[in-house]
């Protein structure tokens, strides 16, 4: 317990002391993050689940394990920095209580998906529906008291950036696991993508009704290129990825972009940005040298073929040249890869965000 308290104090110093410019006002008042292990900053540390990253070597370049599924920072950590905000504390952490919540809260939970059933074999996780409920609690019990009237709170929420990175687990921890889930027997690839988008649309409407207006929808990456999927097949195409899986994800992503367009015209006062993570990350895998990377088909910390048969274990020694790897473990990018993704999706010069960059969204 004592060591946990020490870690929490250290985390507070990091969150409050990093990421926010001292010379300039932030571009947005707050950054609220929803999603899965790609952006979880430690929520799963507080629940009974197998989906945890609270052990070394996770966090090796952060200073200590924080619960992030990475050697260092995630893409939303860098995203917060681009917005001029401190790193966003996890909802279940004591650090998200009080004035800290005014700069944003991270609700993301490893193994979570759009569908409530997704990831259930890991044990507890906060589904996307559950995360939205936590957002509602945040508004009512943690934020409302800081505003003199409801109009000020509505203005604050409307100016805040809402980041949504969800959907990957609905494939790798649901549809692509026929021994555990029936979705692949029930739905074709296209029908499943339709189901995900229909469900997601209703969830986004909940966020809108709670006051969210500026929302960033991150597309799923090329899941057919991650080490865990490569380790399970004997034949890959010339790009080094599993084409069938990438085609499934592309069905979801194309519909997600269409959803952003639709919501921009049907939800008054809202603005949606779609982040084309798939094409960016696929290019990083196929042309790593273009981004200063070297190894793009093997995990820095993993076991078996491509380091993807069994993910990074406690106290396992990771690769030493982590800044040359695209993948940290069997599923997740390295800090270096996350930094590249954030630059191309959050920064002023981002060229993988549609129809505008997150920087421009925040300035609206």
From Swiss-Prot:
Transmembrane spans: none
Gene3D superfamilies found in the cross-reference section: SGNH hydrolase (3.40.50.1110)
Entry keywords, A to Z: Glycoprotein, Hydrolase, Lipid degradation, Lipid metabolism, Secreted, Signal
Location, primary (coarse class): secreted
Subcellular location: Secreted
Keyword Cytoplasm part of the UniProt annotation: no
Single GO BP term: lipid catabolic process
Record flagged with keyword Secreted: yes
Protein EC: 3.1.1.-
Family indicated by similarity: Belongs to the 'GDSL' lipolytic enzyme family.
Protein name (record): GDSL esterase/lipase 7
């Amino acid at each position: 317990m004592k060591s946990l308290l020490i870690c929490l104090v250290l985390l507070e110093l990091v969150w409050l002391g990093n990421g926010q410019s001292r010379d300039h006002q932030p571009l947005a008042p707050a950054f609220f993050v929803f999603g899965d292990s790609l952006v979880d900053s430690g929520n799963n540390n507080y629940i009974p689940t197998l989906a945890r990253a609270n052990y070394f070597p996770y966090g090796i370049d952060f200073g200590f394990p924080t619960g992030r599924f990475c050697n260092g920072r995630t893409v939303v950590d860098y995203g917060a920095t681009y917005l001029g905000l401190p790193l966003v504390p996890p909802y279940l952490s004591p650090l998200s209580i009080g004035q800290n919540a005014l700069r944003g809260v991270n609700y993301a939970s490893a193994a979570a998906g759009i569908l409530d059933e997704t990831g259930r074999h890991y044990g507890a996780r906060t589904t996307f529906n559950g995360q939205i409920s936590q957002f509602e609690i945040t508004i009512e019990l943690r934020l409302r008291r800081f505003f003199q009237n409801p109009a000020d709170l509505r203005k604050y929420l409307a100016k805040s950036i809402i980041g949504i990175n969800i959907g990957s687990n609905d494939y790798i921890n649901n549809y692509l696991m026929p021994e555990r889930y029936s979705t692949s027997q029930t739905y074709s690839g296209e029908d499943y993508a339709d189901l995900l988008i229909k469900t997601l649309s209703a969830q986004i409407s909940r966020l809108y009704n709670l006051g969210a207006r500026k929302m960033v929808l991150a597309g799923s990456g090329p899941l057919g290129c991650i080490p865990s999927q490569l380790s399970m097949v004997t034949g890959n195409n010339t790009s080094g990825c599993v084409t069938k899986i990438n085609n499934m994800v592309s069905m979801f992503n194309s519909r997600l972009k269409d959803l952003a367009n639709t919501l921009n015209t049907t939800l008054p006062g809202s603005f949606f940005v779609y982040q084309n993570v798939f094409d960016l990350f696929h290019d990083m895998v196929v042309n790593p040298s273009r981004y200063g990377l070297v190894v793009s088909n093997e995990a820095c910390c993993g076991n078996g073929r491509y380091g993807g048969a069994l993910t990074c274990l406690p106290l396992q020694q990771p690769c030493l040249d982590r800044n040359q790897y695209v993948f940290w473990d069997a599923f997740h990018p390295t800090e270096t890869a996350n930094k590249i993704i954030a630059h191309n999706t959050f920064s002023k010069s981002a060229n993988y965000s549609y129809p505008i960059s997150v920087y421009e969204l925040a300035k609206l």
